[in-house]
Amino acid sequence: DQPGIVEKLAGTIAAAGGNWLESSMSRLSGKFAGLLLVSLPREHQSELLGALEALQTPTLKVSVEATGITVDDEETGSMVGVEIVANDRPGIVEEIARLLASAQINVVSLETFCESAPMSAEPMFHAQAYLQLPEATSVETLTELLEQLSDDLMVELLD
């Protein structure tokens, strides 16, 4: 991030009559990235698109996509937050993602990082995920499925 980028985006959205609904922003490997969900009257869409394109520089890229959905779209099933910790290894995210997809579990948000274990300094994989479970899938079933991936994988429910 550079000081003022978020402020410029917020001001541009507000000036076009938009409402900043949700966002996820993070700095990763020296780059700042963000996803935004904005509600906006249809008649202001081209105005906002032009204003956002005008913000672009060699170091600031903006991509806009209309979702065609409303914020109040119904989602079935329950939401659950989980923290997953395991020994890090190549492919661990793919293993988890494959398992979730095969169980028809939707990943709403996912944050991952690795850090050294306190005593051994071995790399440990950490994930915090918010998942939308199908109506027929219980939290207990989710936990059992995840823990079957490997003996070292631990799952904790988040509040």
Question: How should these model regions be labeled?
Answer:
Residues 1-159:
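A conserved regulatory-domain signal marking ACT and ACT-like small-molecule sensing domains
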